[in-house]
Amino acid sequence: MKKILLVFTILLAFVISCGKSSDSETLKLNLKEEGKSYDPQLANDSTGEFVDSLVTETLTRQSDDGKSLPGVAEKWEHNADSTVWTFHLRKNAKWSNGDPITAKDFRDGWVRALDPKTAGEYADKLFYIKNAEQFNAGKIKDENQLGIKVIDDYTLQVTLNNPLTYFDSIVRIQTYAPLNKKFYEKVGDKYMTSPETSISSGVYVIKSWTRDSEIVFEKNENYWNKDNIKLKYVKMLFINDPSASVNAFKNKEIDSTNISIEQAKEFKNDKRKILTKDGSVWYMTYNMKNKVLANKKIRQALSLAVDREKLITDVLDNTGEAAYTYTTKGIGIIGVSKDFSEEAGKVFPAYNPQKAKQLLAEGLKELGLQKLPELTMIFNDSGNNKIISEYIQESLRTNLGVNINIEGMTFQSRLDKMQHRDYEIALAGYNGDYNDAITYLDRFLTKDGNNYSDYSNPRYDELVKKVKSSGNQEERVKDMIEMEKIIAEDMPVGLLYYRQNTKLLNPRVHNIVFSPIGKDFVLDNTYIK
């Protein structure tokens, strides 16, 4: 009996020590809710993009300060006018199943992203490539006409429509991920929906997955740079309730979580509380398929009736900044010589309730209406979105005598409604993918996958194409400022603020980067101590 007890004690000690070891190698994050898809050619939300950033590596990767570092490509060069880029892949880059990652894998992934049958919302991110837009539209059927050429197993040559000096930043976007075609054809439509049907070209593999609860990632032992990755595991939990998330942090079930203004009061002098820029611009987006909201003066009236300076001071406790350009300010997006937003100036008009009343009256007259019909604004019910929505609701009631309903829902439900145009007004935000203002401004291009307003302006479309085809930064900035002025006049969105996130971070976590551009988190140098 004593021998049995001794064996049991030893086993228990071993289990406990293993648990402690595992915990010291595991970063635990809360991503609130499941993404719609983790297929890199289909992912279209922040959770999906974060998962893909763990299990997918593209040709280049993002540094802590938002620049491009070698990824699967160990080096690259371009011709004199930046229209032909050649990427040289490292020969020790492997898929998690041991297969080599080749230039053909990138070609296969990009062709799949552009295939009209794939119906990827971010296919337009590849339209820089020669004939990509025509192929996606079905006007060109032969994929060999695309500007994607496999020189050999480890050399990929890409021909662009126009000069693009920052294409090495563009290829960081997950839509540019490689595809292991043999594996993909084996698992079919189950691709990236379970650990068994997932494959990784990146730092981690999916170890386990409990739907709507958690995903555990384990270091990919076939990753070329595995020896320099300190975290063995990343556990991603889905806790959408703000109170439950804070409790999980207190109980050390997660290492970091966003907190609301109200929750931040509890942690007023707590060193675990930090403030980060997340790069997003927030606004009221208007569904212009709605007859009333198709009227520009109505949209202008609603926008001018909300005091965004007061929103920052009175509602958000000075976390964030009132927005006057759609392109987020202060996150490293440079114009000609300084921050693009500063060079553009205060483009969107300031709060003006008198002007708002005048515009409302004129808009109603044009529509032949006596008063504004009942409208509803939807918002995802996390963070500070509810109190922001209530502030907007009260502002419109006080300044315009307009009563709108507000309806909270999950992020995914809000996104689905916007994608299907099953909404009138939505409180929404947008983040850029790379350090250039066009990453924000191209979303108002007619039929862009993120153009949930269904806004269309021929001059704007012309400017987007011009900016994307120009290598002259002074001309590009001039044109992008004109684009800002066009949307400030047409107002497919009513600008509100540039968001900052108040977070709790466990001090055991070191070198985690909360990035305002591209990835939400950069974990390459993160460790637990």
Placement of each model-derived feature along the sequence:
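Structural transition elements
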Residues: 322-363, 382-386
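Gly/Pro-rich hinge or "lid" segments in bacterial periplasmic/extracellular proteins
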Residues: 154, 160-233, 241-243, 354
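Surface-exposed binding/hinge segments that line
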Residues: 88, 107, 121-182
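Ligand/substrate-recognition segments at binding pockets and active sites
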Residues: 211, 353, 357, 361-432, ...
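Detector for C-terminal structural segments
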Residues: 305-336, 383-393, 417-529
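N-terminal lobe/hinge region of extracytoplasmic solute-binding protein
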Residues: 30-80, 199-200
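Ligand-site clamp/hinge motif
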Residues: 221-267
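Alpha-helical secondary-structure segments
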Residues: 102-109, 153-159, 202-203, 231-233, ...
